[in-house]
Regions:
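A ligand-binding cleft/hinge motif common to bilobed small-molecule-binding domains
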Residues: 88-92, 208, 212-233, 282
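Extracytoplasmic ligand-binding site segments that recognize negatively charged/polar headgroups
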Residues: 24, 28-40, 61-65, 77-212
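A bilobed periplasmic-binding-protein/Venus flytrap-type ligand-binding module shared by bacterial periplasmic
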Residues: 129-136, 175, 246-258, 277
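Short alpha-helix C-terminal cap/hinge motif
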Residues: 41-57
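Periplasmic-binding protein-like
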Residues: 112, 126, 186-190, 196-197, ...
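Extracellular/periplasmic bilobal clamshell ligand-binding domains
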Residues: 295-330
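Short beta-strand->loop
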Residues: 99-106, 118-122, 145-148, 214, ...
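Mature extracytoplasmic/periplasmic domains
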Residues: 253-308
Length: 330
């Protein structure tokens, strides 16, 4: 009887494992989204309550790392959804052929420039900015050119554009301001740079530990300190040239093992439950008209929004990264 019992037990285990795999939604995202203090746990709990499934967040360093991982795995990716790319990576991500169209109605999104893309669903947006401590700096730079060209008293930390969407955002921000003169600008910024980190979390932690005067982040970052910590000493430097806008997006992987669950989650992204987790979970603006928490009204609002088209970024990104790299090795 024992061999028979063993076979029954093995069949039960196999069946259970198969059921678990069929009911697990795998989402590639970045580390701060999936972290205990990020929006991931709250979103996971909310979606699992309606899907009768398990949500498995696979945390990578940053948005560019997500795209790099997807490319590396190709058609063998375990991801059902990628969440954490941004508007600047969309064209490049589409060219992989690894993503498929969504069936989500995005008509009610409230993005500054609207939304009509059929592959990507937006889930939050914000503007890149340099955060500083007002108790340590009374006179922040009032423009990118002031920071780069005249403020030799300041030390900066930012992220690598090859692995980080904020780092890429700074690269695009610098290019939009300096154009053909950007190499010289990078060289000047290099003399003020403490380090270039792989992702946002490492950079921001170093700044909070006092290792720099400024850190590349978002205009919404001070809201975290104000709301979560009741600390009003952090602010962002408002630059006269304007600030580069980022829209973060999610997409369904073409080879998704759990296609129906993926479709369900893609629609869930624009629900009030998901969107209300963005301001105080991801510390970004929601893309629908959910109410913003008290404290967001104190944030600096850029006087101008800067951007390149996704197609232009896809065409020029490698060249602009080489510009950045060559400037750092002068």
């Amino acid at each position: 009887m024992k061999p028979t019992l063993n076979l029954i037990a093995l069949a039960a285990i196999t069946s259970t494992s198969a059921f678990a795999a069929e009911n697990t939604l795998t989402i590639y995202t970045y580390d701060s989204f999936a972290a205990d203090w990020g929006p991931g746990p709250k979103i996971e709990q909310a979606f699992e309550a309606i899907c009768s499934c398990d949500v498995n967040f696979v945390a990578l360093d940053d948005g560019v790392s997500i795209l790099n991982r997807l490319r590396l795995e190709g058609g063998n990716s375990k991801a059902d959804i990628v969440l954490g790319l941004d508007n600047n990576l969309m064209a490049e991500a589409k060219k992989t052929g690894l993503l498929t169209e969504h069936n989500v109605d995005t008509a009610n999104t409230v993005l500054p420039n609207g939304w009509s893309d059929t592959t990507f669903v937006p889930y939050d947006y914000g503007y890149f900015a340099f955060v500083y401590n007002t108790e340590k700096m009374a006179n922040p730079p009032k423009s990118m050119k002031e920071l780069v060209e005249t403020r030799d008293d300041l030390k900066v930390i930012y992220q690598d554009p090859r692995t980080s969407t904020p780092g890429q955002g700074l690269m695009l921000w610098m290019k939009s301001i300096y154009g053909d003169d950007v190499t010289q600008a990078w060289q000047k910024l290099a003399s003020k740079t403490v380090t270039v980190t792989k992702g946002w979390s490492e950079a921001y932690s170093m700044f909070l530990n006092g290792e720099s005067d400024l850190v590349l982040s978002y205009t919404t970052s001070p809201a975290y300190h104000l709301i979560a910590e009741n600390d009003s000493k952090f602010a962002t430097a408002n630059f006269a040239e304007g600030h580069y806008m980022q829209v973060e997006v999610a997409a369904k992987v073409k080879g998704a093992k759990n296609s129906e669950l993926a479709d369900q989650f893609m629609n869930f992204i624009l629900s009030d439950e998901f969107q209300s987790a963005m301001p105080t979970g991801n510390w970004m603006y929601p893309v629908t008209d959910v109410e913003l928490p008290k404290g967001f009204e104190t944030l600096s609002v850029p006087n101008k929004s800067l951007s390149f088209s996704a197609d232009e970024v896809a065409k020029m990104r490698k060249s602009w990264i080489r510009e950045w790299q060559s400037a750092l090795t002068f």
